[in-house]
């Protein structure tokens, strides 16, 4: 049995419309220098007929269309990864699976977690591909949602800077034992998690949070996850081991 798994193919869909970040920040009466530091010039905007499902399908369709019927039938798992879910019970993977015309001999489910769900889905798919020899399709898809008042004033001033830097997009990854794009190292990982109230979205169109707390939590998790990684993987070096950083 192969001990290799990872990303066989990958595709991105960023929508068909965008806004100029500088113009948007000026309209919201924000300091443009903050967005210059982020090296941003444009942000995608979902059109009224677009949602996380349509974004996900557009990301995955070129990958699936390039596969032979036999290869498509080897996809035994479709995972959607999002924090923009459209249903409390039904997974978006069911819609994406149907629109892509994939075999019904397939597992369909969704992972919800801010920022981490795409990575979690990829790791889950890689483990499945490693154990079964089948392929898995991972679709990370999100639409940023911001509610703003008229006259350029954001309803939530603390989060008004997030609007110009948040957009919409989807990435589809075909995961298998033929990792032409990226090979994952099985068993090499670091764990560190805890609850922190840095962000909260209790209803679909409203969000609250603490950006400073979020940043500090990320740094804390990065440091301690690396320590756990180093305890599992011999000879690891932060500067030399991770070629893609």
Report each predicted region and the residues it spans.
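Flexible, glycine-rich active-site loops centered on histidine and acidic residues
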Residues: 130-172
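Active-site-adjacent elements of ketosynthase-type condensing enzymes
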Residues: 87-95, 123, 131, 143-154, ...
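Condensing-enzyme catalytic core mediating Claisen C-C bond formation in acyl metabolism
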Residues: 1-50, 156-228
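Short coil/turn connectors at secondary-structure junctions
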Residues: 2-4, 73-76, 103-106, 130-136, ...
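Conserved catalytic cysteine-centered active-site region
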Residues: 33-37, 42-50, 84-135, 141
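Short glycine-rich or small-residue beta-strand-to-loop segments that form or flank ligand, phosphate
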Residues: 76-84, 110, 245
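Phosphate/pyrophosphate-binding loops at sites that engage ATP/ADP/AMP, CoA/4′-phosphopantetheine
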Residues: 32, 59-76, 223-243
């Amino acid at each position: 049995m192969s001990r290799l798994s990872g990303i066989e193919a990958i595709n991105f869909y960023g929508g068909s419309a965008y806004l100029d970040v500088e113009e948007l920040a000026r309209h919201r009466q924000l300091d443009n220098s903050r967005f210059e530091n982020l090296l941003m010039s444009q942000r995608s905007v979902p059109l009224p007929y677009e949602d996380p499902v349509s974004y996900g399908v557009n990301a995955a369709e070129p990958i699936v269309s390039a596969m032979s019927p036999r290869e498509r039938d080897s996809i035994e798992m479709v995972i959607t990864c999002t924090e923009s879910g459209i249903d409390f019970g039904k997974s978006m993977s069911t819609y994406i699976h149907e629109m892509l015309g994939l075999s019904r001999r397939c597992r369909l489910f969704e992972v919800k977690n801010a920022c981490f769900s795409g990575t979690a889905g990829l790791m889950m798919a890689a483990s499945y591909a490693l154990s079964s020899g089948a392929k898995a399709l991972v679709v990370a898809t999100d639409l940023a949602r911001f509610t703003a008042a008229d006259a350029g004033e954001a309803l939530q001033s603390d989060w008004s800077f997030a609007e110009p830097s948040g957009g919409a997009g989807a990435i589809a990854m075909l995961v298998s034992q033929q990792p032409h794009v990226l090979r994952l190292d099985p068993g090499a990982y670091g764990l560190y998690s805890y609850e922190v109230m840095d962000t909260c979205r209790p209803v679909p169109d409203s969000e609250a949070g603490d950006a400073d707390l979020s940043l500090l939590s990320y740094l804390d998790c990065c440091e301690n996850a690396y320590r756990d990684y180093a305890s599992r993987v011999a000879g690891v070096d932060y500067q030399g081991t991770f070629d893609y950083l």
